[in-house]
Structures are given as C-alpha cells and as structure tokens.
C-alpha cells in the first residue's frame, strides 16, 4: 500500500529575488552617470573600477529611494546597517567583489498584498511576505559577438556602464505557489516602484530583473525540497511560463526517481524550457566581510518621518478605495491603478464632477487605446481631465448621446478643447423637446404604414426598426428614453 504522504498533491514553494535599479542620476558610490544606452564604457571612473587609492561614498539619494521602497513594502527600517564585500570572480565585475549588504540589510520583515487573476478562476487577494530589502551595486554587462549567448559566440566584450548602478534587491518569503502568483507579485513590485518614482521598472533595459527560487514537496506540511534558481526572464509572462515549466520538470523528476540538484538554470524563451547553467553557490562561497571603506549606515528619525510623508497613495490602497468608495468593479479598479498617471487622470476627472463608473469606462476604453497606440502618456494627453469630465457630464445629463461623444472624441484627443463648445458650435446637442420628437415620429409612422400595421398586429420587435429610423433622421441626437416613450405611445395608437 502506498505511503499516505505520496497520496498528497504536489505543492510548489516559490520565492523571488527582485533586483530594482534605482533611478538616480549618478551611481551608488560615485558621480559617474547612470544613463542607459550610451556608448560602451563611457560611464566608468576609478571608483567603479576599484583602482588603488579610490574610496566609495554612498549616494544619499540611493539611501532615500531604498528607504522609501522599503516603507512602501511595509518593511522595518534598520536604525543601523552596513555594507559588505561579496567576493566572486566574473568578467563583468571590475573589482572582483561586489559591494552589497549581508547580515545587516537596510530593511527586513515586510509584506505586500497581491491581486491574483488566474484565467478561468475567481480573482483572489494574497499577502506575500518580504524577507528583506538591501542595497548593492550592479555589475557590468557581457556582450557576446556573433550570438546573443556565450554559446555560439566568437568572442565576448564587457561594458562597464552598468557597473556601480544602484540596486535595491527585494527578497520575498517562499509564500508563492504558482507561476501566476509569481508573475503577479513581480508586477506589483514594479507597480509600487513606479508609483514611488524610484525606478522606471523597464524589464527590457534591465531596470527590473527577477530570479526565481523553486522547490516542490508533497503537501503543505512536508519539508522543502531541493531549491533550484531560475534566471533570464525579461517579462512577467516569461516568469509565469518559466515557473510553471520548472514545477512540472521537478515533479516529473521526483516521480521517475531522477535527482533534483541545487543549481542555477536559465529560461530559454525560444525553446520554452529551463536549462542548467551552473551549480548554485551558498553564502559561504562568497566570503562576505564588512567593507572597510564604507562606514555604518544610519537613518535618523527625522529622515524617516520626512520620507514617509512624501510617499504617495499606493496601488493596493487605491484599488480598495475605488471599489469601496467609488463603487467600481474589481476589474476597473485594477486597470485604472496599473499606471499612476492613469489613476491620477481618473481622479482628476472624478474630482471635476464626473460619474466614476462612466469616467472609468471612457478612460480604460477609448482613451487607453489612444494613449497606447500613439505611445503617449496620460500626462501628455492634450485632452485634459477637466475636459473629459465635462464630456462625461454632458452624457450623464442627457445633453449628448454616447454616439455623439464618440464622434467628437478623436478631435478632442488630438487637440483638446471644450466638448460643450464643440457641441454648441455644431448643433450636436440632444433633442429633448417632446414636441419636436413627436413631429418626427408622426412623419416616420406616416412613411411606414405597413410596418405600423404589422406592429399593431403583434410584431412588437418592429419598435427597434422605428427607433433606428428616428436616430438616423436626427443624426443620433434624439433623447433615446424620450424617443422610445413617444414611439411606444404612438405605435399603440396613442
């Protein structure tokens, strides 16, 4: 008889290490520029290269950004922390050690709330613990000639422009269980960093990079299995696919008696699988010791209070407020808060007096489509929030129809302007005079006697035909509610 433990379903145990490039103008320990995309090796200096006689000095803006990020992740800020040297030899590391934080990070023990939308399942909220956030310097970048990878290349070059750029490494607790949860967690981290303005989170440019640690076990009470690290995922979709693949690979290995070894694997986007890269190092392999060139880091109570006061309302808080106070659906709240500029635009529209639900529909629909297709931002949109608010209030007040609004919208999106002024100038306002609509209805009924007779004979669906004719004759300007009311009365012989 099979052991009871083998009857339990497999469970994945997943944690993420998220490396966030902090958006400072200069590097973490030197004044060298952090500009992305310039000629190789144009943003290096003696400090970056670790030349004899140079001393690093902590960029105070890096400390501010790291503390703000930690606060947004509900982490406890350390009164005292320090930098350490992490020893390893690799061509993209000019000093042969990396300045990082080991046993005294800047912040520990936090959490974030993640909204998980699984396809075909109900959306659910999950709290993910965060173990720590620490500051460190980035490494350079290897460029392989003749191939995107080392394999197949003729030679490799190293670009140190990225070396010394400030990073905040955010280490989650192993609270994630699926590829979707991992992707949603990473997405929420980026969303928070963007709201704070401490990073652009551009994964294609390496501003946000994730390493995933995965193991599987039989049931939630079983000990953790052998942990495998996955690298080389440059999108949230890649994170989800890599995790899902690795879970299946490990489960299959255990079920067929193959060993699962502690190693680092790379996600191959083309082949949609993970491949072994190297054995995974432990902390002892790096021979950490306190950096003798950098003093202890202290964050004063005044600094904490000042930086906390500058924090914006964060995405999760906005989502709850939009749903609870404004009556928006979970979906609308999620879409509107995805980018801070969209959320700010929406709030300005509602503050100017427009209905929240109607405003959300226009912003997440027509406006978002225009912004995305034209590669604009909501902040740069000529159609200002108060102008959209005016248009929404015209619709909500029965002054114009949705059809008319869509007709004038392209011009407004391109040039901005007052919707009311355009409506008044072109005579596009809704016809809401009962006598005027009644006269048009009488004319229509007189022009279609056979349809009138058929309606009175029981084919009541013909009312839709008359509504269509009425709207066609009025250019969509007749008040729909009033038009239906008068049509119904007249068709019944009233």
From Swiss-Prot:
Xref: SMART domains: GatB_Yqey (SM00845)
GO biological processes: glutaminyl-tRNAGln biosynthesis via transamidation; translation
Catalytic activity reported: L-glutamyl-tRNA(Gln) + L-glutamine + ATP + H2O = L-glutaminyl-tRNA(Gln) + L-glutamate + ADP + phosphate + H(+); L-aspartyl-tRNA(Asn) + L-glutamine + ATP + H2O = L-asparaginyl-tRNA(Asn) + L-glutamate + ADP + phosphate + 2 H(+)
EC number of this enzyme: 6.3.5.-
Source organism, top-level taxon: Bacteria
Keywords: ATP-binding, Ligase, Nucleotide-binding, Protein biosynthesis
InterPro entries xref list: Asn/Gln-tRNA_amidoTrfase_suB/E, Asn/Gln-tRNA_Trfase_suB/E_cat, Asn/Gln_amidotransferase, Asn/Gln_tRNA_amidoTrase-B-like, GatB, GatB_C_1, GatB_Yqey_C_2, Gln-tRNA_amidoTrfase_suB_CS
Family: Belongs to the GatB/GatE family. GatB subfamily.
Name of this protein: Aspartyl/glutamyl-tRNA(Asn/Gln) amidotransferase subunit B
């Amino acid at each position: 008889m099979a052991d009871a433990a083998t009857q339990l379903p497999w469970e994945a145990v997943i944690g993420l290490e998220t490396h966030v490039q902090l958006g400072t103008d200069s590097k973490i320990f030197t004044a060298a520029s952090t500009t992305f995309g310039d000629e190789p090796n144009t943003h290096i200096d003696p400090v970056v290269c670790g030349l004899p006689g140079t001393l690093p000095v902590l960029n105070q803006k890096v400390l501010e950004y790291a503390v703000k990020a930690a606060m947004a992740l509900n982490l406890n800020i350390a009164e005292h922390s320090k930098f350490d040297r992490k020893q390893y030899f690799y061509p993209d590391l000019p000093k042969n050690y990396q300045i990082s934080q080991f046993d005294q990070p800047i912040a520990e023990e936090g959490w974030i709330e993640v909204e998980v939308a699984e396809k075909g399942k109900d959306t659910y909220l999950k709290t993910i613990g965060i173990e720590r956030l620490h500051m460190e310097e980035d490494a350079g970048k290897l460029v392989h000639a003749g191939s995107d990878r080392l394999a197949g290349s003729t030679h490799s070059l190293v670009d140190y422009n990225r070396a010394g750029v400030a990073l905040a490494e955010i280490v989650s607790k192993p609270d994630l269980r699926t590829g979707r949860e991992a992707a949603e967690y990473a997405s929420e981290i980026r969303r928070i960093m963007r709201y704070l303005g401490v990073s652009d989170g551009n994964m294609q440019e390496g501003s946000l990079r994730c390493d995933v640690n995965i193991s599987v076990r039989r049931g939630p009470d079983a000990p953790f299995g052998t942990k495998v690290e996955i690298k080389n995922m440059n999108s949230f979709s890649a994170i989800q696919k890599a995790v899902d693949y690795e879970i299946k690979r490990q489960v299959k290995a255990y079920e067929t008696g193959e060993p699962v070894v502690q190693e680092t694997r790379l996600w191959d986007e083309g082949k949609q699988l993970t491949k072994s890269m190297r054995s995974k190092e432990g902390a002892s392999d790096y021979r950490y010791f306190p950096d003798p060139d950098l003093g202890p880091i202290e964050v004063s109570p005044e600094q904490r209070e000042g930086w906390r006061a500058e924090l914006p309302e964060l995405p999760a808080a906005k989502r709850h407020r939009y749903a609870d106070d404004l009556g928006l659906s979970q979906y609308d709240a999620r879409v509107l808060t995805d980018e801070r500029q969209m959320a700010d635009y929406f709030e300005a529209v509602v503050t100017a007096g427009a209905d929240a639900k109607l405003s959300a529909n226009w912003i997440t629909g027509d406006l978002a489509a225009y912004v995305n297709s034209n590669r604009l931002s909501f902040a740069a949109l000529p159609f200002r929030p108060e102008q959209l608010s005016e248009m929404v209030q015209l619709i909500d007040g029965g002054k114009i129809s949705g059809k008319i609004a869509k007709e004038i919208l392209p011009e407004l999106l391109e040039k901005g302007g007052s919707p009311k002024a355009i409506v008044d100038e072109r005579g596009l306002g809704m016809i809401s005079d009962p006598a005027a609509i009644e006269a048009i209805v009488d004319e229509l009924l007189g022009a279609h006697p056979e349809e009138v007779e058929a309606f009175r004979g029981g084919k009541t669906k013909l009312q839709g035909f008359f509504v269509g004719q009425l709207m066609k004759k009025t250019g969509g300007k007749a008040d729909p509610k009033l038009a239906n009311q008068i049509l119904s009365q007249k068709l019944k012989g009233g």
